[in-house]
């Protein structure tokens, strides 16, 4: 079989930078899936992407499908021939459909009978005749939320398409993609190199684009160049560039020929909080800020231009002129905001509605303040500081800086709190109240920050559930799932002695008559149980372990964590499987019992040696188990209970639980109930698989 390399490039107008990687990856994944479905072998596949092109390269692609033999079974011999041995109409019709005579058919014998058989040789289709349709289907499946039309064309795509190149080796693959006929014309850089050129061979794609078109189509190579050059440029001025990957990806997706340059701004702007300057540089201008080795912002930034200029200083000056007014705006906002304290801004919060049924932001911060102070008493934090931080937690929403740069909420509150003479703990709590903001984000660890972050999230959760607006399906407009996971993570990672039932009840009390949902407490608790499951599944904990703990509905996150660890460890023990099965059996037996069981085991009614042994073993363990469960030492308790395996196995082998004698039966049921109760102090291990 022969092989060739395939190139498919779609040349477009500038593609959305934040979608570029996903589009290219999806294009490649869709096309390789098509190749697999078509049974076309290939060695490897890669994608390339730049602002004006999506491309895929398939290496060592088979030039045709392999020939194959397809077995087509006909009627059974009994139905294929009549009593005289002549072919029936069924046999003749089947043979005719396969282009043969009945006499040419083979026989297939199995242990179930004998059938007519035709082994048809199917010649593989040439790859080049399949490529265009496969590529079009691959493009049709791209994740494009809002496709657009252009010109008089009815074709839709994420951006207007100008060129399509499909080369199998040196041969142009005939066909159209998105209404554009395939040829070998490739468009180069918009301002440098050849505006377009003909590509002679698929293998030369990257080299020709680089040398003729002044385009680095290899996305990863382009990203690596930007990163390396930016690091070198920062080091040259004694700093370190902030090369956050999301911004690095976006910049990589904005340029086809990256040139890294260094610029500066006036040092006076460094009096403005660094976060505001960084937000402006990164968010608005796509610049990389530069910090010194101590983490202090330098009056420099690194940017990437898409052209190799003969006068780079002119480009540098241009970018400095562009960023200066933005930094000046930040400076003005900061200086203006400093004239009014966070406390003085509390009155203005009365004019802003948090949610129609839940009142104003002023009412919200009063609730957060009270709840933060309440939480502080449970974790030995300063309740006055916690209440103060809660009260000031939303004042920065009324500042010019946050109104202009909304992502700086909390952060600017911290800076203004410091300027207002608030304690450092209060100031930091304002910045950390929204943490964790995303998966993988850190959680607050300072006591006052913990109190405010928990109060802020619980107020939202209980309030929104309390007015009947719980998340439905994928919709979660108030980010309640994130808030609930945040509460759990803060409690778990700080090992806090807090109970969700208590926290929910206090938050509900503070909302007062605002809440119309009578079942709010139970619904919020159930929501937390769902978040427990999601959180631990993401951590790789087995679902059956999670369900075993959830069955007991522990409402203190730290306690939940202890149970999870204990059950996960128990599951690794040799005795676990047998004891889980025994617990399941006990659970099923007890579920069928009608009426109440004896409160205690009557030793006089223990007649079989096996039940005596089990009762004795349980009695021996109970004094040891009680303090372990009281201390939430579930792992050691379950390890002790694992020693019951032999006694339990022997009991079920030798003892008839449902004895005819009612007293014996009830006593044995009481024994099993006592056994199960010990395990249930930790979890329902009958749910372990």
Swiss-Prot record:
It catalyses: tRNA(Gly) + glycine + ATP = glycyl-tRNA(Gly) + AMP + diphosphate. InterPro entries: DALR_anticod-bd, Gly-tRNA-synth_bsu, Gly-tRNA-synth_heterodimer. SUPFAM superfamilies: HD-domain/PDEase-like. Keywords: Aminoacyl-tRNA synthetase, ATP-binding, Cytoplasm, Ligase, Nucleotide-binding, Protein biosynthesis. It is found in: Cytoplasm. One of its GO terms (molecular function) is ATP binding. Its EC number is 6.1.1.14. It comes from the Bacteria. Gene3D superfamilies: Isoleucyl-tRNA Synthetase, Domain 1. Belongs to the class-II aminoacyl-tRNA synthetase family. Tetramer of two alpha and two beta subunits. HAMAP family: Gly_tRNA_synth_beta. This is Glycine--tRNA ligase beta subunit. The gene is glyS.
């Amino acid at each position: 079989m022969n092989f060739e390399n395939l190139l498919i490039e779609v040349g477009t107008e500038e593609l959305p930078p934040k979608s570029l990687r996903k589009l290219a990856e999806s294009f490649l994944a869709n096309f390789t899936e098509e190749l697999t479905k078509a049974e076309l072998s290939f060695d490897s596949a890669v994608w390339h992407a730049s602002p004006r092109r999506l491309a895929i390269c398939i290496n060592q692609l088979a030039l045709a499908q392999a020939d194959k033999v397809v077995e087509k079974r006909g009627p059974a011999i009994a139905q294929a021939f009549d009593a005289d041995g002549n072919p029936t109409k069924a046999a003749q019709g089947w043979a005719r459909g396969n282009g043969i005579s009945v006499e040419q058919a083979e026989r297939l014998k199995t242990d179930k009978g004998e059938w007519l058989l035709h082994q048809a040789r199917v010649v593989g289709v040439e790859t080049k005749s399949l490529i265009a349709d496969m590529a079009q289907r691959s493009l049709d499946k791209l994740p494009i939320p809002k496709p657009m039309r252009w010109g008089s064309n009815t074709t839709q795509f994420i951006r207007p398409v100008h060129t399509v190149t499909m080369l199998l080796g040196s041969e142009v693959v005939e066909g159209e993609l998105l209404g554009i006929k395939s040829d070998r014309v490739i468009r180069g850089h918009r301002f440098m190199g050849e505006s377009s050129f003909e590509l002679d061979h698929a293998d030369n794609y990257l080299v020709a684009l680089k040398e003729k078109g002044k385009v680095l189509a290899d996305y990863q190579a382009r990203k690596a160049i930007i990163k390396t050059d930016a690091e070198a440029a920062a080091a040259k001025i004694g700093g370190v560039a902030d090369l956050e990957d999301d911004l690095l990806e976006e910049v990589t997706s904005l340029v086809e020929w990256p040139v890294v340059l260094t610029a500066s701004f006036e040092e006076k702007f460094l009096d403005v909080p660094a976060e505001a300057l960084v937000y402006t540089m990164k968010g608005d201008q796509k610049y990389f800020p530069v910090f010194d080795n101590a983490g202090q912002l330098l009056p420099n930034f690194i940017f990437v231009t898409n052209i190799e200029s003969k006068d780079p200083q002119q480009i540098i000056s241009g970018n400095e002129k562009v960023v200066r007014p933005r930094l000046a705006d930040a400076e003005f906002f900061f200086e203006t905001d400093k004239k009014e304290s966070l406390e003085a801004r509390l009155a203005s919060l009365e004019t802003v509605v948090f949610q129609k049924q839940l009142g104003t932001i002023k009412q919200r911060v009063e609730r957060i303040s009270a709840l933060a102070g309440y939480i502080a008493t449970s974790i030995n934090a300063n309740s006055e500081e916690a209440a103060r931080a809660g009260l000031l937690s939303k004042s920065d929403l009324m500042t010019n800086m946050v109104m202009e740069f909304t992502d700086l909420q909390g952060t600017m509150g911290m800076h203004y709190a410091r300027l207002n003479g608030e304690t450092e703990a209060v100031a930091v709590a304002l910045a950390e109240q929204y943490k964790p903001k995303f998966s993988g984000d850190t959680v607050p660890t300072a006591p006052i920050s913990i109190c405010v972050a928990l109060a802020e999230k619980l107020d939202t959760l209980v309030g929104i559930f309390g007015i009947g607006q719980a998340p439905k399906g994928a919709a979660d407009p108030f980010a309640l799932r994130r808030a609930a996971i945040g509460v759990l993570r803060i409690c778990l990672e700080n090992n806090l002695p807090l109970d969700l039932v208590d926290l929910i009840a206090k938050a509900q009390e503070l909302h007062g008559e605002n809440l119309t949902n009578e079942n709010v407490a139970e619904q919020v608790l159930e929501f937390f149980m769902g978040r427990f499951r999601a959180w631990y599944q993401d951590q790789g904990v087995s679902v059956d372990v999670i369900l075993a703990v959830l069955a007991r509905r522990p409402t203190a996150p730290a306690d939940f964590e202890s149970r999870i660890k204990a059950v996960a460890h128990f599951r690794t023990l040799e005795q676990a499987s047998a004891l889980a099965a025994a617990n399941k059996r006990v659970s099923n037996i007890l579920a069928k019992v009608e009426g109440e069981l004896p409160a205690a085991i009557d030793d006089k009614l223990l007649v079989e040696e096996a039940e005596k042994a089990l009762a004795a073993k349980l009695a021996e363990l109970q004094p040891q188990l009680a303090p372990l469960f009281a201390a939430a030492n579930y792992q050691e308790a379950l390890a002790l209970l694992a020693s019951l395996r032999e006694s339990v196995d022997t009991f079920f082998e030798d003892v008839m639980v449902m004895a005819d004698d009612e007293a014996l039966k009830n006593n044995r049921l009481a024994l099993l109930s006592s056994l199960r109760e010990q395990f249930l102090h930790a979890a329902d291990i009958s749910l372990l698989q």
